[in-house]
């Protein structure tokens, strides 16, 4: 069961119960796996956070991933508290780059701008982080051109 990927305590407990083991046997087996070092929610939470950051996910996505894996609250809080703002910033920058490559006209067309923002929000970044990142990268204005009230180049319908 643990051969394919690391599992949380709750995942192991659920799988054993689904296979029909008695709760006392399940509890004893979970305790044995923890003592043997084969079951560690803190290590799992750290690894899951690193994995999510590598693919450009933000803090909210990390929290959601840890909940899906049913990692204990203490282990999740510890792993999240160890996150470096710089590492999270790198993940955000990568996600911004991906989003702007995917939607090349995002600076000029309101719908494309909304798509970029939705993409980044779906990856777990907060709106404040997005505004700051887009502003720092000079991507909140279309190439420094004059813009109308909607932020579009003059004359764009």
What is the predicted function of each stretch?
Residues 1-157:
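An alpha-helical, amphipathic repeat domain used for nucleic-acid recognition
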């Amino acid at each position: 069961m643990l051969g394919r990927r690391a599992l949380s305590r709750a995942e192991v407990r659920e799988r054993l119960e689904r296979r029909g083991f008695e709760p006392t046997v399940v509890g004893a087996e979970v305790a044995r796996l923890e003592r043997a070092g084969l079951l560690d929610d803190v290590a799992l939470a750290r690894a899951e956070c690193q994995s999510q950051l590598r693919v450009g996910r933000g803090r909210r996505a990390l929290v959601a991933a840890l909940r899906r894996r049913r990692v204990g609250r203490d282990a999740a809080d510890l792993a999240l508290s160890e996150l470096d703002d710089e590492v999270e910033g790198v993940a955000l920058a990568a996600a911004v780059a991906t989003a702007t490559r995917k939607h090349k006209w995002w600076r000029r067309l309101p719908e494309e701008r909304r798509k970029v923002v939705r993409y980044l929000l779906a990856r777990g970044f907060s709106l404040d982080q997005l505004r700051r990142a887009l502003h720092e990268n000079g991507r909140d204005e279309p190439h420094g051109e004059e813009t109308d009230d909607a932020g579009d180049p003059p004359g764009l319908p």
